[in-house]
Curated annotation (Swiss-Prot), chain A:
It comes from Arabidopsis thaliana. One of its GO terms (cellular component) is endoplasmic reticulum. Belongs to the membrane magnesium transporter (TC 1.A.67) family. Pfam families: MMgT. Its main location: endoplasmic reticulum. Residues 24-40 are lumenal. The lineage of its organism: Eukaryota, Viridiplantae, Streptophyta, Embryophyta, Tracheophyta. Disulfide bonds: none annotated. Keywords: Endoplasmic reticulum, Endosome, Golgi apparatus, Membrane, Transmembrane, Transmembrane helix. PANTHER family: ER MEMBRANE PROTEIN COMPLEX SUBUNIT 5, PTHR21181. It is found in: Endoplasmic reticulum membrane; Golgi apparatus membrane; Early endosome membrane. This is Membrane magnesium transporter. Mediates Mg(2+) transport.
């Protein structure tokens, strides 16, 4: 569990509290026999803050973007496999040298 | 022999080499972000009490903000992480619409009807 997940949970809790406040406000309007036009200001502020927190959580919690280019620093091969005896370079493929500039 | 070798070299140099695993990871991250924000947008639309087309306009506004956020997350250089800009901006734009409508009607019923 990390910060993004906690922020997302906190945002959902704020939205839940905003929903509960709106339910209370609707009950109050029923008592006063008035029509519902929009939620009160504090509920709107809670909704905006909840949306901002959930937006931040949605952009951080699912994970980072990884580079798709094989020659970037993130995709460097930093170790060789254990079975080095099976790595044979002298085969018929040497007639077609690869054009990929791999960094090892 | 020389021409066939040259042709194979040209074919190999024309095809760009991408890391498919990392591209799949990036697309999965985008899908998860958009799905979660579709659900949150539905809950917000229900609590505020949106009806009709205003709710769908709200959904597209939230998706646009998500696109800007994903652009910022990619560092405004989509070439490093994706094969085109459309992957960041528009991929999955309509995918969360059903989740949005589901949670929109659910939250509206909870808050305004029951």
């Amino acid at each position: 569990m990390n910060l993004g997940f906690l922020v997302g949970v906190f945002g959902v809790l704020i939205l839940s509290h905003a929903a509960y406040s709106t339910i209370q406000y609707r009950g109050l309007l029923k008592i006063m026999e008035e029509e519902f036009s929009r939620p009160p200001i504090n509920v709107i502020l809670e909704l905006i803050i909840g949306l901002a927190l959930c937006m931040w959580a949605a952009l951080t919690f699912p994970g980072k973007f990884l580079s798709i280019h094989p020659d970037s620093d993130e995709n460097r091969a930093v170790f060789l496999p254990d079975n080095s005896d099976f790595m044979i370079f002298n085969h018929r493929g040497r007639l077609f040298p690869p054009q990929i500039d791999m960094k090892f | 022999m020389g021409s066939s070798e040259k042709r194979s070299k040209d074919i190999m140099s024309d095809i760009p080499t991408f890391s498919a695993e990392n591209l799949q990871n990036n697309l999965k991250v985008i899908q998860n972000s958009r799905t979660f924000l579709s659900i949150i947008a539905g809950v917000l639309a229900g609590i505020i009490g949106f009806n009709g087309l205003i709710g769908f306009v709200f959904y597209f506004v939230v998706m646009l903000i998500t696109s800007v956020g994903l652009m910022a997350k990619a560092g405004f250089s989509a070439d490093l992480y994706f094969d085109s800009w459309n992957r960041v901006l528009f991929d999955g734009f309509l995918g969360g619409l059903m989740s949005f409508v589901l949670f929109w009607t659910f939250a509206y019923d909870l808050v305004h009807i029951f």
